[in-house]
């Protein structure tokens, strides 16, 4: 395709708000254009890359007998009410009404729709297992869209759903999909690591995320250097090893702590280590108030809290609720009170004697509070995030951290949706049973960004040849010169028989063409320049920068060999 006919609006400068490298490069190379916050148009080069990614996804889905369908993006509220997610999903769900006042959602996922389809049509165990997938735009009302395609309000996903009669069948499909995802990410040129993860709003009992390693990743991966252990930090278990207490109990003492609002401020004010301070937080669980304690240098993990209590309906109490309950604002709270409020504490609170807690009076704290003497803890548990260097739960050594971008996730949903939506089948005894389900997603547009995050240099993108928008970049330095233009036209005709060729025939300066070529990042560049009269062209690899002068008589064989070795 001639570049003069292709819409590739490259940029010299990118908007200041483009934080992620992939966002800057995709804008600068003319692949995407922002419509509004979190919403982008995919321009010709991006559309070609997306097509290539989707082709690989389809090949791998068909390899494991997944069947492609296409479901509506507009979903009626009644289906979501059946599953219970209409009220539970939260403000990220884009809701709207038609002219008759009927409520709908723009689908972030399709569990409800696909379950309704299958329950109406699938009747017998003889029709199982069944795996359906689609590639479609999804919608999520992100509070703060950022990083370009990595966290947007409209995005492209491949989502698949499997249906089973028994656990063994679900396990087999889960493993097939897990393996297929590994192949997909390898083929598209991403270093993606599977990690144990939380199932979030989708639900289910077992899940892995595939994380593309990146400095701007919004998720932290906890991993071992001695084993294959890897988990999202939300799921990484903290191993508790009791430390014997040696301090004598000291008298409980109330002190004034004016204008102190955080654990760090309190530690500085008292000249104490942060790990000797206790943070007290009040939550509402299904309408009931509880207090949760963690040490000052630890961060509470609400995902673990939800897992411990077996509900997603957990939220921090508001300041007004806390004041009405305990008589003080956050920053002065503690477990020493005579209220009927259950207290839960992270395991490592057990290691402390004579701890510092809020006095439940603004501007005051208590020194030397002790469990069993001054307050009781109803239960201890793992309620916090692991710290780098702490021992891992598999015993393989210290925790190491890396940042990652989630590009895929696989779930075992079990009967979460089939039971709530009455999706059953008849087993071999003729008895109705709820369908077992799996759910599997790949962020196709996220994958586009992740590829760019991992494949670039200071000059631009370096496309893996499996997804590149064009195979070769043919450049004529000066198309006004007959020898260059005629040779370039001849080579274009020859090369496009076996390759997708982007032919830069524009009447631009050589520097502009070379800068754009580096920025766009096609795997191989063929330059027709000053030696055209002698039949000599320059062939250059984008990834290594290696170049060679080649006679046109040998060009096809040279390019074939070069391309096969990339």
From Swiss-Prot:
Keywords per UniProt: Aminoacyl-tRNA synthetase, ATP-binding, Cytoplasm, Ligase, Nucleotide-binding, Protein biosynthesis
Family as reported in the entry's similarity comment: Belongs to the class-II aminoacyl-tRNA synthetase family. ProS type 1 subfamily.
Family annotation (PROSITE patterns): AA_TRNA_LIGASE_II
Pfam families for this protein: HGTP_anticodon, tRNA-synt_2b, tRNA_edit
Function according to Swiss-Prot or TrEMBL: Catalyzes the attachment of proline to tRNA(Pro) in a two-step reaction: proline is first activated by ATP to form Pro-AMP and then transferred to the acceptor end of tRNA(Pro). As ProRS can inadvertently accommodate and process non-cognate amino acids such as alanine and cysteine, to avoid such errors it has two additional distinct editing activities against alanine. One activity is designated as 'pretransfer' editing and involves the tRNA(Pro)-independent hydrolysis of activated Ala-AMP.
Protein name (record): Proline--tRNA ligase
EC number: 6.1.1.15
Gene: proS
UniProt main location, coarse: cytoplasm
Assembly and interaction partners: Homodimer.
GO cellular component entries: cytosol
Domain of life, per lineage: Bacteria
GO MF term set: aminoacyl-tRNA deacylase activity; ATP binding; catalytic activity, acting on a protein; proline-tRNA ligase activity; transferase activity
One of the GO BP terms on file: prolyl-tRNA aminoacylation
The record's note on its domains: Consists of three domains: the N-terminal catalytic domain, the editing domain and the C-terminal anticodon-binding domain.
InterPro entries the record matches: aa-tRNA-synt_IIb, aa-tRNA-synth_II, aa-tRNA-synth_II/BPL/LPL, Anticodon-bd, Anticodon-bd_dom_sf, Pro-tRNA-ligase_IIa, Pro-tRNA-synth_IIa_bac-type, Pro-tRNA-Synthase_IIa_type1
Reaction equation(s) it catalyzes: tRNA(Pro) + L-proline + ATP = L-prolyl-tRNA(Pro) + AMP + diphosphate
Cell compartments where the protein resides: Cytoplasm
